[in-house]
Amino acid sequence: MSVSVAAEHDYIGLSEFPTMEATTMSDKTKTRDNNNGLNFKATELRLGLPGSESPERVDSRFLALNKSSCPVSGAKRVFSDAINDSNKWVFSPGSTTATGDVGSGSGPRTSVVKDGKSTTFTKPAVPVKEKKSSATAPASKAQVVGWPPIRSFRKNSMASSQSQKPGNNSETEEAEAKSGPEQPCLYVKVSMEGAPYLRKIDLKTYKSYLELSSALEKMFSCFTIGQFGSHGGCGRDGLNESRLTDLLRGSEYVVTYEDKDSDWMLVGDVPWEMFICSCKKLRIMKSSEAIGLAPRVMEKCRSRN
């Protein structure tokens, strides 16, 4: 009668020699993985310098790290291919093969191989559109309200408008040259003895002493003013001494003016253009008070001549 020896099983997972069994199991796992063609050691991520390879990584038949000598259809070119062969691109031979030359003036030439027959054709070069030599003027900006200040905006807009319209400026300058410089207004005050108010007139609007006298009469219609044209007419050259004296005696009021030297003179003693340039103020005074002005007027006219 044979006695069977009970086999001892480790149900908990513990053994007397855990280290040895773990080593044996790892060796068995590595052997099984190598037999199956899997190399997990080579695919582990490790720390190291850029470009360095782990000595434990071994190229297998399934993981080829070296560049294939024959290009595969649809594969991307690496950096060395782009440098060494910059003028051509090559696809793997198959049903259709295309090879093009880059940089030719007539466009890329393409060779197509289909069913053992080769056909080469050249694509027409795409014409390059020439840039317009005359650059279009920038559109004017919309008016800005607020900040920045409007004064600077107006200054810039005026400068741009002047630069955009050179023809109009030249036409304006020619018109101004023909018509002459625009003369400013020459306003002087007019006072009269006995009148409680003053008036102002523009001497540039009158062409002679007669027009000035008529205008002053309309301003002060309640007073009688000596007419410069009643004694033979007073033109643009003024009056002589006898006519000035007759004017003072035959009228109640006469027109005098203050010149640049602050002297009071009778109106009509000098030519009209000289009177306009030298007149600072007009005053209508009584003829009895202006009798002494006539001799002084003639003396001053003689000294000027």
Curated annotation (Swiss-Prot):
GO molecular function: DNA-binding transcription factor activity; identical protein binding; transcription cis-regulatory region binding
Keywords, ordered alphabetically: Auxin signaling pathway, Nucleus, Repressor, Transcription, Transcription regulation
Protein's GO biological process: auxin-activated signaling pathway; response to auxin
Residue ranges of every copy of the PB1 domain listed in the record: 185-287
Residue ranges, compositional bias (Polar residues): 155-170
Keyword Nucleus: yes
Classification via InterPro entries: AUX/IAA_dom, AUX_IAA, PB1-like
Listed PROSITE patterns: PB1 (PS51745)
Region Disordered: start-end pairs: 96-119, 155-180
Keyword Transcription belongs to the record: yes
SUPFAM superfamilies per the UniProt record, alphabetical: CAD & PB1 domains
Domain of life: Eukaryota
Domain-level remarks: The N-terminal half of the protein contains two conserved domains I and II. Domain I includes a slightly degenerated ERF-associated amphiphilic repression (EAR) motif which seems to be involved in the activity of transcriptional repression. Domain II is required for the correct degradation of the protein through the SCF-mediated ubiquitin-proteasome pathway. Interactions between Aux/IAA proteins and auxin response factors (ARFs) occur through their C-terminal dimerization domains III and IV.
PANTHER family, A to Z: AUXIN-RESPONSIVE PROTEIN IAA17, AUXIN-RESPONSIVE PROTEIN IAA27
Record function comment: Aux/IAA proteins are short-lived transcriptional factors that function as repressors of early auxin response genes at low auxin concentrations. Repression is thought to result from the interaction with auxin response factors (ARFs), proteins that bind to the auxin-responsive promoter element (AuxRE). Formation of heterodimers with ARF proteins may alter their ability to modulate early auxin response genes expression.
The name this protein goes by in its record: Auxin-responsive protein IAA27
Organism this protein belongs to: Arabidopsis thaliana (Mouse-ear cress)
Lineage: Eukaryota, Viridiplantae, Streptophyta, Embryophyta, Tracheophyta
Gene: IAA27
